[in-house]
């Protein structure tokens, strides 16, 4: 059946995402790969990586997501237990949590949520970081023991799609278009659009806009002017940007 947008492209400029799928009928796109998910499938996504679920059938969709700020990850890391390094190592890697590990993760996530909801009460901030550390350590220990099972059953994007992504990543601040990208790759615009949509679940132009908006978000945080941001990220028309 024809897939439907489950959401727009996701991108986080300063957060890691731990995603665990529980039920539904979706493909998930991250980095240069996609996977049809089953209960217990999980994914770690680093900051600045585009990712998205893509709904196959109109069924209930349930997942658990934990977002962790990059600075928190660095704070929790030690020379012996460098959580930051391991999350980077497993960026955009799919892995499957067996029932026992999945239930442990869900229990941990409930504790994180409990202390997040009461984080202004005495002790809750410390307990929040403690349970977050426990959850991340459990995940990394599981991955270390099951490295040979990472990215099983994935679909890797063809070179043409990967090259289109790389070209956009390198040139999105310039005056590019789907037509100019197609010319560079020596392929028709319609064929490129079809392939890109099929493998990524999104249009090529949406990918360009997403990259530009990510950079714009960073520059806004740096308190740059809107006009400066508009032209710096590749929008040649101020009205299009706002």
For the regions a protein language model found, what residue spans apply to each?
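Generic protein-terminus/edge-of-domain signal
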Residues: 1-42, 49, 57, 78-85, ...
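Short hydrophobic/aromatic patch on the recognition helix
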Residues: 40, 191-196, 240-241
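Conserved hydrophobic/aromatic pocket- or pore-lining residues that grip, position, or stack substrates
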Residues: 135, 168, 192
């Amino acid at each position: 059946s024809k897939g439907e947008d489950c959401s727009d492209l996701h991108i986080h400029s300063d957060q890691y995402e731990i995603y665990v799928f529980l039920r539904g009928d979706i493909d998930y796109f991250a980095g240069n790969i996609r996977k049809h998910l089953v209960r217990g499938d999980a994914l770690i996504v680093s900051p600045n990586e585009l990712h998205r679920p893509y709904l196959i059938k109109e069924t209930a969709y349930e997942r658990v997501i934990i977002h962790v700020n990059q600075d928190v990850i660095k704070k929790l890391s030690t020379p012996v237990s460098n959580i930051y390094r391991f999350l980077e190592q497993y960026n955009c890697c799919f892995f499957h949590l067996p029932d026992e590990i999945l239930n442990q993760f869900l229990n941990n996530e409930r504790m994180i949520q409990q202390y997040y909801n009461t984080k202004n009460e005495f002790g809750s901030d410390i307990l929040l970081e403690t349970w977050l550390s426990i959850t991340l350590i459990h995940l990394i220990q599981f991955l270390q023991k099951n490295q040979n099972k990472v990215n099983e059953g994935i679909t890797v994007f063809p070179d043409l799609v990967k090259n289109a992504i790389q070209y956009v990543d390198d040139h999105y601040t310039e005056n590019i278009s789907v037509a100019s990208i197609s010319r560079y790759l020596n392929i028709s615009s319609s064929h490129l659009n079809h392939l890109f949509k099929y493998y990524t679940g999104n249009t090529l132009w949406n990918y360009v806009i997403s990259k530009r908006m990510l950079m714009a978000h960073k520059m806004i945080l740096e308190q740059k002017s809107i006009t400066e941001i508009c032209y710096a990220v590749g929008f040649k028309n101020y009205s299009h940007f706002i």
